[in-house]
């Protein structure tokens, strides 16, 4: 439903926004030192996340970066929270809603379906803000974000948590996603039916094959019974 414009300036501009906030609030290091330290911390966190499928909040990344640079700010400090907000503000510039997303959710609600979102993201509050900004939040019964429950897709725990919040069994649910390893495999492993939005040509093995493949979100309405 939500896509990110991953152009060449995306990551760098988000990081510069964090640095600008920190520089204006007493953190006296060069951008080069900050960037190098941040990228090292991020790499270490990503490696742990990929092994454990646990999702720490983005503020952990900021706090650990600052501590390595000699500034003892924990995740609850106003400085770390402000840096996270700076990141979020810049990030929002690169997010856009999939065409017809609101209409699809509205039609599904009219047909009597409960809907939810499972998102792998380290800034939960930003996800809520984005969903609200694009008029999607009011059509969702459940919103599950990895950093809120410290589990990320394809961990079965995050899918089961969402199912429990919706009050449905896996066999009654359909999961729609655009990645095989994260979305489709994870949902299949807990017994959900799956729909792959194939945004680009994908080599699909028999063990990863979704129940349905569509080209755009609006095609989902041709699959879901009236």
For each feature predicted by the language model, list its residue ranges.
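N-terminal helical cap/lid subdomain that shapes the substrate entry/recognition surface
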Residues: 1-98, 107
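Asp-based, Mg2+/Mn2+-dependent phosphohydrolase catalytic module
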Residues: 4-9, 25-32, 102, 106-109, ...
């Amino acid at each position: 439903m939500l896509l990110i414009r991953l152009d060449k300036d995306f990551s760098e501009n988000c990081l510069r926004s964090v640095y600008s906030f920190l520089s204006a609030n007493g953190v006296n290091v060069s951008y080069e030192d900050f960037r190098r330290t941040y990228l090292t911390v991020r790499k270490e966190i990503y490696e742990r996340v990929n092994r454990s499928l646990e999702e720490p909040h983005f503020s952990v990344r900021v706090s650990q970066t600052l501590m390595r640079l000699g500034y003892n700010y924990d995740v609850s400090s106003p400085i770390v929270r402000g840096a996270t907000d700076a990141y979020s503000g810049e990030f929002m510039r690169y997010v856009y809603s999939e065409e017809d997303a609101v209409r699809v959710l509205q039609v599904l609600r009219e047909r009597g379906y409960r809907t939810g979102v499972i998102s792998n993201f380290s800034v939960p509050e930003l996800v809520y803000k984005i969903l609200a900004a694009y008029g999607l939040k009011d059509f969702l019964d459940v919103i599950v974000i990895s950093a809120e429950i410290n589990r990320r897709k394809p961990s079965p725990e995050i899918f089961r948590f969402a199912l429990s919040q919706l009050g449905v069994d896996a066999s009654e649910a359909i999961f729609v996603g655009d990645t095989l390893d994260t979305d489709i495999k994870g949902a299949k492993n807990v017994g959900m039916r799956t729909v792959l939005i194939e945004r680009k040509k994908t080599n699909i093995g028999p063990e990863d094959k979704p129940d349905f493949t569509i080209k755009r979100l609006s095609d989902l309405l041709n699959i879901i019974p009236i």
